[in-house]
Amino acid sequence: MSLSFDPQAGLIVVPTRIWGPAGETVARLALDTGATWSLLSWDVAVLLGYDPSIVQERLQIVTASGVEFVPTIGLQKLEALDRTCEGFPMLCHTLPMGATVDGLLGLNFFQGHRLVVDFREATVTLD
């Protein structure tokens, strides 16, 4: 499946359908090949019925403000770029004020697949 994007926009935003205990939503996740893990905003996780505050499993990440330990949740289901994952592991973290996305699609989503970002055609393809 190919997704069109605006090469002048700065971020490549991937519409991502996510299911949780309280329902489903379409989140706006930035494609981020510099992120090892995919990340969902704390607010969206809570909206979907997850409670990141009670999660025992935490992963150390480095942010612009320092080192933090953030909860990891297993999503009921996630669909993006024609790929469906059940139990997909995702970090939860508060995003900065003014963020225009709901999180990041990182390398753990793309591993084992071929990702092509074509700036001439302004498309993203995941095989």
Model-identified regions with their sequence ranges:
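Pepsin/retropepsin-fold aspartyl endopeptidases
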Residues: 1-127
